[in-house]
């Protein structure tokens, strides 16, 4: 496996990004060693919060949420998925599969050995993060689920069809502009540049190119069986489950219903519909902080 590593200089002086990098080395099933980056802020003994990003962003998406949750006493951990952010980037599209992403993040999570986690997940952060919950339910105390899903081959929305077509056919993938198109507010040039920073050129974007192809939208997809098995675990997850989908996301709009109906911890919870686009972390970070804080406070889990 050929692995690319974005030069550290690409991350110097990013707007609103004061966080020290942390790195963990994981070993792929094929023997390749991969360096995974994560942010780890707040008190070590704070109630831990795991923030998981998706396509095609990185932990920068949580830059306004991380310090606010840390200020409320939480230990806040935000990893970059392999292929994104400061994490290593396999150079071949064929190196990226759904199951490999789950395995990579599982190895990282086991290495940290955290328990009592509250997960906030959006986009592929949910497709992978919810698989982590199913694999390690004993490590998670509560979930906040936003603009994501755990599909099992039942088709796709028109919004996802449009995104799939765009992602596979655009000659050069404009990462920062893609994020900007998925927000309710206009990002600044400096913010757009920060989303572009992990990708010096197109060779670094194979993970971003491949992600849309990995969503299990057809019954024959290789990961349908694994997601069905994950749902069987999630349907018995005992902790609180709060949905926080946005009203302006054509890809996942309405997706909260399946979580509210199938997960017992969602019953009677203060679910929210937030005003924002697909990347609602950019549009309503304060709301997200309040929601996550309410779920993650130890007294709310007693």
Swiss-Prot record:
Catalytic activity: 1-haloalkane + H2O = a halide anion + a primary alcohol + H(+)
Xref: InterPro entries: AB_hydrolase_1, AB_hydrolase_fold, Epox_hydrolase-like, Haloalkane_dehalogenase, Haloalkane_dehalogenase_1
AB hydrolase-1 domain ranges (all copies): 48-150
Leader sequence residues: none
SUPFAM superfamilies: alpha/beta-Hydrolases (SSF53474)
Positions annotated as active site in the UniProt record: 123 (nucleophile), 249 (proton donor), 278 (proton acceptor)
Keyword set includes Calcium: no
EC number: 3.8.1.5
Function, as annotated: Catalyzes hydrolytic cleavage of carbon-halogen bonds in halogenated aliphatic compounds, leading to the formation of the corresponding primary alcohols, halide ions and protons.
Family under the similarity heading: Belongs to the haloalkane dehalogenase family. Type 1 subfamily.
Name of the protein described by the UniProt record: Haloalkane dehalogenase
Native organism: Caulobacter sp. (strain K31)
UniProt gene name: dhmA
């Amino acid at each position: 496996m050929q692995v690319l590593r974005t030069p550290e200089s690409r991350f110097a002086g990013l707007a609103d990004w004061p966080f020290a990098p942390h790195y963990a080395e994981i070993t792929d099933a094929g023997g390749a060693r991969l360096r995974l980056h994560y942010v780890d802020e707040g008190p070590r003994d704070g109630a831990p919060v795991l923030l998981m990003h998706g396509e095609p962003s990185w932990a920068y998406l949580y830059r306004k949420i991380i310090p606010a949750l840390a200020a409320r006493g939480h230990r806040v951990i935000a990893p970059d998925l392999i292929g994104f952010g400061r994490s290593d980037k396999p150079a071949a599209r064929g190196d990226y599969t759904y199951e490999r992403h789950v395995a990579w993040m599982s190895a990282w999570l086991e290495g940290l050995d955290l328990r009592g986690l509250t997960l906030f997940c959006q986009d592929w952060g949910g497709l992978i993060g919810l698989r982590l919950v199913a694999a390690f339910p004993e490590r998670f105390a509560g979930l906040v689920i936003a603009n994501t899903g755990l599909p099992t081959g039942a088709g796709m929305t028109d919004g996802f069809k449009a995104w799939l077509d765009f992602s596979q056919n655009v000659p050069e993938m404009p990462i920062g502009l893609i994020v900007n198109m998925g927000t309710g507010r206009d990002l600044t040039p400096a913010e757009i540049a920060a989303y572009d920073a992990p990708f010096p050129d197109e060779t670094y974007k194979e993970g971003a190119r491949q992600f849309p192809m990995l969503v299990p939208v057809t019954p024959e997809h290789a990961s349908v069986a694994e997601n069905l098995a994950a749902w069987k675990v999630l349907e018995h997850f005992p902790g609180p489950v709060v949905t926080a989908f946005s009203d302006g996301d054509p890809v996942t709009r309405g997706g909260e219903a399946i979580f509210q109906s199938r997960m017992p911890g969602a019953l009677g919870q203060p679910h929210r519909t937030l005003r924002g686009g697909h990347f609602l972390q950019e549009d309503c970070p304060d709301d997200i902080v309040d929601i996550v804080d309410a779920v993650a406070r130890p007294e709310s889990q007693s």
